[in-house]
Amino acid sequence: MNGADLRIGIAGITGRMGKLLAEAVPLAGATLAGGIGRDGDLAALARESDVVIDFTVAATVSRHAGILAAAGTPWVLGTTGFDPAAEADIADAAARIPVFQAANFAPGVNLVIALAERLGATLAAETHDAEILEMHHRQKIDAPSGTALAIGAAVARGRGVDLAAVKDSGRDGHTGKRETGAIGFAALRGGQIVGSHSAIFTSAVEQITLTHHALDRRIFAEGAVRAALWLAGRAPGRYGMRDLLGL
């Protein structure tokens, strides 16, 4: 299916990202099938759409997974901050429909994620401490950001460990010395910062920093629409920016 024939629906069209998506869809040569707010009729939207892009809230993810799987409609999911139960529901949906999930749709930040994994594999945890720093606008409701967690997970994969076993995001007060192999997180909030992420590797003799600054929220909308165009016609399964970018 070419872009001109592709009907894209937007869940969360009344939000900041949803409005940008509504502008980005026709610019990419696709057709805007319609959109709903977080409490709208997703089943009806799914019937009118070849792909649904979802930027709503974490509490809706499980319900949306069931509705879109039942409708057979491919799903581009940009919502973050959901719990393990919702993650399981996404996996169940991916057995029936193609699901494209990303914490961040900017190509550049996904290159940072790929490089973070490479550095995690190359720089020993015993010599190089890994810290993830992120800053976002004051309205953001989850921390660390989904992108920060994705960067941390990439470092952990490179080191052959599970992020949950080494994640340190609660430093406050008398914490004691830093644990060898820990992956630390710090989240800053203020103003209207679109999104800044850094992966910092520090040893006794050097420091390596990977940084990405998003300057305009349109980069996320354009990436999500690109993902929708790519996802249409794919087999059921889970896909992400690595697949889209060939990383």
Curated annotation (Swiss-Prot):
Xref: HAMAP family: DapB (MF_00102)
Matches recorded under InterPro entries: DapB_C (IPR022663), DapB_N (IPR000846), DapB_N_CS (IPR022664), DHDPR_bac (IPR023940), NAD(P)-bd_dom_sf (IPR036291)
Residues the record lists as binding NAD(+): 12-17, 78-80, 102-105
This protein's name: 4-hydroxy-tetrahydrodipicolinate reductase
Reaction catalysed by this enzyme: (S)-2,3,4,5-tetrahydrodipicolinate + NAD(+) + H2O = (2S,4S)-4-hydroxy-2,3,4,5-tetrahydrodipicolinate + NADH + H(+); (S)-2,3,4,5-tetrahydrodipicolinate + NADP(+) + H2O = (2S,4S)-4-hydroxy-2,3,4,5-tetrahydrodipicolinate + NADPH + H(+)
GO MF annotations, alphabetized: 4-hydroxy-tetrahydrodipicolinate reductase; NAD binding; NADP binding; oxidoreductase activity, acting on CH or CH2 groups, NAD or NADP as acceptor
EC assignment: 1.17.1.8
Gene: dapB
NCBIfam families: dapB
A Pfam family annotated for this UniProt entry: DapB_N
GO cellular component: cytosol
Annotated source species: Acidiphilium cryptum (strain JF-5)
Cell compartments where the protein resides: Cytoplasm
